[in-house]
């Protein structure tokens, strides 16, 4: 038997996918990078508060990097805006596993923009907490 054939995976069920290990490694590096960006450029928090939808003015490169990181996160556990009454009352909800109802936060917001910025701030807090 040749050396190449001995190292082949014959039964895929015996193969452990190591991509999760690398994802965790690089995700921790990205979290540190994101917090460094926020600490070195605190003006991006004010920029987001003034324009949470991003349609008034194109976001700065630093804010774009933070947004890109938040958007690439797994769906379960993400925050979204729940509208209690259209154009009037908004809350933050958390996406949960299939078949589970979303978890609604207690805090209420008058505008969707206020709620969007609150989600942004909460995501920053979560990243800081994960690094602590």
Curated annotation (Swiss-Prot):
It catalyses: N,N-dimethylformamide + H2O = dimethylamine + formate. The keyword Transferase does not apply. Its EC number is 3.5.1.56. Disulfide bonds: none annotated. Activity is slightly inhibited by Mg(2+) and Mn(2+), and slightly increased by Cu(2+). Activity is slightly inhibited by the chelating agents 8-hydroxyquinoline, ethylenediaminetetraacetate, o-phenanthroline and 2,2'-bipyridyl. GO terms for molecular function: N,N-dimethylformamidase activity. Optimum pH is 6.0-7.0. It comes from the Bacteria. Optimum temperature is 50-55 degrees Celsius. Stable up to 50 degrees Celsius, inactivated after incubation at 60 degrees Celsius for 30 minutes. Activity decreases below 50 degrees Celsius, with 20% of activity retained at 25 degrees Celsius. Keywords: Hydrolase. Hydrolyzes N,N-dimethylformamide, and to a lesser extent N,N-dimethylacetamide and N,N-diethylacetamide. Has no activity against the substituted amides N-methylformamide, N-ethylformamide, N-ethylformamide and N-methylacetamide or the unsubstituted amides formamide, nicotinamide, acetoamide, benzamide, acetamide and acrylamide. Heterotetramer of two DmfA1 (alpha) and two DmfA2 (beta) subunits. This is N,N-dimethylformamidase alpha subunit.
């Amino acid at each position: 038997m040749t050396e190449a054939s001995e190292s082949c995976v014959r039964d895929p069920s015996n193969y452990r996918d190591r991509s999760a290990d690398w994802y965790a490694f690089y995700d921790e590096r990205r979290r540190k990078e994101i917090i460094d960006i926020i600490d070195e450029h605190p003006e991006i928090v004010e920029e987001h508060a003034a324009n949470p939808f991003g349609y008034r003015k194109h976001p700065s490169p630093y804010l774009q990097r933070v947004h890109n990181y938040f958007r690439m996160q797994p769906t379960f556990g993400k925050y979204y805006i729940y509208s209690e009454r259209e154009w009037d009352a908004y809350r933050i909800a958390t996406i949960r596993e299939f078949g589970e109802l979303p978890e609604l936060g207690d805090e209420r917001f008058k505008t969707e923009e206020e709620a969007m910025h609150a989600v942004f701030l909460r995501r920053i807090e979560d990243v800081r907490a994960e690094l602590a």
